Structures are given as C-alpha cells and as structure tokens.
C-alpha cells in the first residue's frame, strides 16, 4: 500500500486526486490532506479517505475545522508546511501559486520518494535550487500538468537526440477575439474555458496565455532543455498534449481526452497504469488543428523567452510569476482590464532593479515580496480601474 499526502486537496486538481484515491482505497493509505480555507470540504475528504492529518492555511478557520472533525482521530495543523514534513511514498502538491514552494521544499526534505507536482510555480521560481535539492535527496518529481506529463512520459522512453519539445496551448476562450474585443473582456468570460475545467487563477492564465509562458519556463527547468528547443503551438482541441521531435525527424506525441484524471492517475501509479473510463476515440474527434500563436494579441509568450534569455533568468522568473499573481487577482476583482494583466507584468519586470544570487528559499521569498510591492504600485498608479 502506498502512503500518500495531498497538499491543496480542495482545489480543482486536488478534488480530482481525492476522487481517484477514493476509488482505490485498497492501493493507497492517505496520510495527510491540506486546504487553504475550504474547511468543510477538507473535513469531508478526511473522513472519506480516513486521513490521519489535515492542515488548514487560514488559521481563523481552525476551530471550524476542529468542530467538523469531532468524533474522529484526525490530527489538525495550521499551514500545509506543517504536514509536508510527514514522510510518504508519494505527495501530490496541488497548491496554487508561489504559496506551494515552501511546502514542496519541505516535502523534499521529509524523505518522501515521489512528488506529483501540479504547482508549476515551484519549478518556475524554485528553479535550480529546488531541483538540486530534489536530486540530492533522490526525490523524483512527476509533473501533473498535462503538457509536462506528456513530455515526461515520452522522455522516460527516450531522452537522447531531442531536437525540440512542443507544448500545446488551447488558446483559451478568446483565441479568435480581436484586440478590441479583448479590451472589453469580462471576468465571467475569462473563467469559461472551452476545453478544461479549472480554478479561477489558471483559467485566467490560460486566457492570457501566461499559463503557457510559465509552462515554457517550467519545461526549461524541469527537463534541462535550452529555451531555443522549446516551442508552444496553439491546438484548440486540446487532444495532443505534448510532442517531442527527435533529430532524425520522428515526432512522438501524447494524445488523450481533456481530463486531469489521466495525468493524475499516471503520477499516482507510474510507471504502472491504472484503468480509467475515459478513452479517446479519434473517429469521433473529427479534426485536429494547429496554428502559430498570435503574439500581438497574446504577448505573454514572448515574456517567457525574454526571461529565459536574460542575464538573471531565475530572478526574472520570480518577478514574472509574482506580478502575474497580483495582476490576475486585480482582474478577478474587476479593478483592471484583461489586457492590462500582461502590461502590469511587463512593467514590473522593467521596474525591478535588484538582481541577487539565489542561494536559499529566503532569497526567493524576498524577490517575490519586492516584486509584489512593485506590481501593486503599478496597478495603483498606472492602470485605470476597469468598469
């Protein structure tokens, strides 16, 4: 029986993971679960999976969680970091944003063998520091993002003579919008993704294509491949998740339905494969289309290459991620327009002046903190409130 933990169990990926685990109780013993604020769902999940530990990040909800778990033996902590130290065979980390970095580092130190990682920000911002620590501790990182999971599976079979890797992007809900239409995008439209069911933040990132910018940086770090060998193409059907092109001209691609249960299941069971109901039928799919991204309407992609080709790629990765988290949050509150999201990110990157060597988690946190201050100032002073 595998011992597992799920950090961020009440988000979209976390809920999918819990659903899979609930159907495979004979295979997995759930040691720990964590959530930011959804104490009611966390308590339900803990009872469903017979979890030994739970953690809530919002300490104001500790009493509510405790009351919800009365009559059980579940131990309660505050903050995912406090249960990330529990050694397990596999830890699923599905916390959203930079908040996941600390817990990931703790999981690496805990003696856990495998991390199934849905938190791309950890790889984007943690970079070499995180991956070096994982290598020292002999911790395998399996990405859950469908694109990186696809590339991971292909490279597991053959990582020699790679010419390039191709990440596919759905293009989001505004793929065919004009610039004028993009200026008037409302929040509810940005949250309506055509092919994936995701949380608010990643839905907006997909709409701006900032998600793909972050994924390019993630791919560079995770697969140790140079930026000029990473390409992103638009594939609206989201059936082809990743492609690896080899020097002899052969291309290996992973095709699957748009269901996060598929990469999650692989991460849980790999290298074995567990049966799932959703199977791809290409005859019913009809056509698969591919196109170049439009950088004028979706300039976020260029920022990823600017970051990776800069003199301080890790610092700039942290700045980009922090500014984007601030800008997306302001958009979700309808304080700035859709096109202003990338503008805030770009302005923050231009305004950030102090570049330091990154030798610790504290260095990353400090850069992230300073970037957020700059991004907030840019929002307040340069961006007209959206209405």
From Swiss-Prot:
Protein function: Catalyzes the NADPH-dependent rearrangement and reduction of 1-deoxy-D-xylulose-5-phosphate (DXP) to 2-C-methyl-D-erythritol 4-phosphate (MEP).
Binding positions for 1-deoxy-D-xylulose 5-phosphate per the UniProt entry: 120, 146-147, 170, 193, 206, 211-212, 215
Domain of life: Bacteria
Keyword ATP-binding among record annotations: no
Species the sequence originates in: Wolbachia pipientis wMel
SUPFAM superfamilies xref list: 1-deoxy-D-xylulose-5-phosphate reductoisomerase, C-terminal domain, Glyceraldehyde-3-phosphate dehydrogenase-like, C-terminal domain, NAD(P)-binding Rossmann-fold domains
Cofactor list: Mg(2+); Mn(2+)
Record-stated family: Belongs to the DXR family.
Keyword NADP: yes
EC number(s) from the headed UniProt entry: 1.1.1.267
EC category: oxidoreductase
Biological processes annotated in GO: isopentenyl diphosphate biosynthetic process, methylerythritol 4-phosphate pathway involved in terpenoid biosynthetic process
Annotated transmembrane regions: none
Residues engaged in binding NADPH: 10-13, 38, 119, 121, 199
Keyword annotations: Isoprene biosynthesis, Manganese, Metal-binding, NADP, Oxidoreductase
Annotated protein name in UniProt: 1-deoxy-D-xylulose 5-phosphate reductoisomerase
InterPro entries listed in its UniProt record: DXP_reductoisomerase, DXP_reductoisomerase_C, DXP_reductoisomerase_N, DXPR_C, DXPR_C_sf, NAD(P)-bd_dom_sf
Catalytic activity: 2-C-methyl-D-erythritol 4-phosphate + NADP(+) = 1-deoxy-D-xylulose 5-phosphate + NADPH + H(+)
Molecular-function GO terms, alphabetical: 1-deoxy-D-xylulose-5-phosphate reductoisomerase activity; manganese ion binding; NADPH binding
Binding, Mn(2+): 145, 147, 215
């Amino acid at each position: 029986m595998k011992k597992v933990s799920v950090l961020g169990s009440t988000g979209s990926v976390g809920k999918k993971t819990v659903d899979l685990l609930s159907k495979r109780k004979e295979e997995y013993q759930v040691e720990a679960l964590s959530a930011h604020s959804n104490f009611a769902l966390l308590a339900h999940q803990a009872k469903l999976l017979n979890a030994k530990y739970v953690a809530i990040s919002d300490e104001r909800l500790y009493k509510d969680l405790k009351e919800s778990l009365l009559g059980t033996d579940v131990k309660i902590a505050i903050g995912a970091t406090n249960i990330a130290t529990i050694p397990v065979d596999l830890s699923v980390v599905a916390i959203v944003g930079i908040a996941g970095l600390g817990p990931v580092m703790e999981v690496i130190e805990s003696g856990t063998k495998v991390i199934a990682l849905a938190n791309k920000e950890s790889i984007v911002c943690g970079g070499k520091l995180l991956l070096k620590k994982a290598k020292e501790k002999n911790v395998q990182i399996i990405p859950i993002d469908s694109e990186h999971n696809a590339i991971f599976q292909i490279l597991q079979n053959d990582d020699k003579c790679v010419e390039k890797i191709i990440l596919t992007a759905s293009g989001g809900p505004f793929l065919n919008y004009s610039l004028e239409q993009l200026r008037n995008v409302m929040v509810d439209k940005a949250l309506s993704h055509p092919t994936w069911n995701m949380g608010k933040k990643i839905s907006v990132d997909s709409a701006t294509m900032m998600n793909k910018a972050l994924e390019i940086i993630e791919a560079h770090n995770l697969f140790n491949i140079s930026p000029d060998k990473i390409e992103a193409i638009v594939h609206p059907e989201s059936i082809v998740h990743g492609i690896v092109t080899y020097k002899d001209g052969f291309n290996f691609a992973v095709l699957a339905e748009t269901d996060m249960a598929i990469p999650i299941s692989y991460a849980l069971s790999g290298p074995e494969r567990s049966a799932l109901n959703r199977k791809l039928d290409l005859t019913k799919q009809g056509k698969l289309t591919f196109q170049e991204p439009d950088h004028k309407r979706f300039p976020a992609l260029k920022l990823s290459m600017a970051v990776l080709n800069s003199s301080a790629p890790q610092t700039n990765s942290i700045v980009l991620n922090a500014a984007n988290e601030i800008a997306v949050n302001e958009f979700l509150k309808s304080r700035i327009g859709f096109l202003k999201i990338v503008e805030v990110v770009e302005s923050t990157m231009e305004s950030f002046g102090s570049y330091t060597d990154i030798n610790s988690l504290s260095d990353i946190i400090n850069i992230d903190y300073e970037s957020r201050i700059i991004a907030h100032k840019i929002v307040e002073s340069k961006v007209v409130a959206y209405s």
